[in-house]
Amino acid sequence: MKNKKRVLIASSLSCAILLLSAATTQANSAHKDSQDQNKKEHVDKSQQKDKRNVTNKDKNSTVPDDIGKNGKITKRTETVYDEKTNILQNLQFDFIDDPTYDKNVLLVKKQGSIHSNLKFESHKEEKNSNWLKYPSEYHVDFQVKRNRKTEILDQLPKNKISTAKVDSTFSYSSGGKFDSTKGIGRTSSNSYSKTISYNQQNYDTIASGKNNNWHVHWSVIANDLKYGGEVKNRNDELLFYRNTRIATVENPELSFASKYRYPALVRSGFNPEFLTYLSNEKSNEKTQFEVTYTRNQDILKNRPGIHYAPSILEKNKDGQRLIVTYEVDWKNKTVKVVDKYSDDNKPYKEG
């Protein structure tokens, strides 16, 4: 009898434990499902927010800003891509409506991408048959077309910059006052700010000394290039050189250091961010701007295999450019593309 009671008690305890375990598992599962659902909803909301942000960024907009009691900003964006040159222009036009200033105000931010178009080529007709074409210079040019009533008053960047990263902030205050500083951030409590930020490791930015009130030009030029454990100047014929018996005319890439070691601006390309501040007399209704993005290429020529033949360097031997003309309607604060063309074998040459 005692043994029967023990069996019944043990059986009851086992059932209770099983029921408790099942309930706990179900509760944990429900809690996990709830957590997963919350997480999914959070992710979905975050993605929707990101989509809204992207959509809002892409739209032309008029927004109030801290530039005076009745000041406002109208933003426009124009994008032009050219497949032949692999160059993209993305321009932001910020119209500043300042009732305390007697002129129209416009900030133009020049963005986009100039792909490197890095190429290894084989030219069997030459002794130095293995060629490397790489982007030694990038150029951005902005000019006002035949209109003296529209003037360029400021630009970013200025002078020469050799740091790996370029950061600057332009600030506009009511009454036509403007200022610019290095770094990112507002320069005063009552202003509209616009920043530029881009990478140029192993390159230098140089603002042309010939810039004036209707024309500005920036050059981004290779300097000392670091790849793997090597550091060589752009003017060195042995730049990216590799003397190896496995290189053949059929495999020109083997005559040079691995491209995965090259600096980003050589391997991938350049993403410019340049800023121009303009004023326009209110009697003038429309102005055209011509914007040119150019890629200059140096050619390095090596002879395949083990040898003592010198390498050959040809600077600015090739180049491609994209030229776009934009028209600004000052009264309606709109922008449109009125002309576009591109060409090869057109490296930029100052003069």
From Swiss-Prot:
Family affiliation: Belongs to the aerolysin family.
Transmembrane region(s): none
Keywords (A to Z) from UniProt: Signal
One GO cellular component term noted in the UniProt record for this chain: extracellular region
InterPro entries the record matches: Bi-component_toxin_staph, Leukocidin/Hemolysin_toxin, Leukocidin/porin_MspA_sf
Domain of life: Bacteria
Pfam family, one: Leukocidin
BP GO annotations: cytolysis in another organism
Biased composition, class Basic and acidic residues, residue ranges: 30-60
Organism: Staphylococcus aureus (strain Mu50 / ATCC 700699)
Gene3D superfamilies for this protein: Leukocidin/porin MspA
Annotated spans, Disordered: 29-71
Keyword Signal: yes
Protein name from the UniProt record: Uncharacterized leukocidin-like protein 2
Keyword field contains Disulfide bond: no
UniProt signal peptide: 1-27
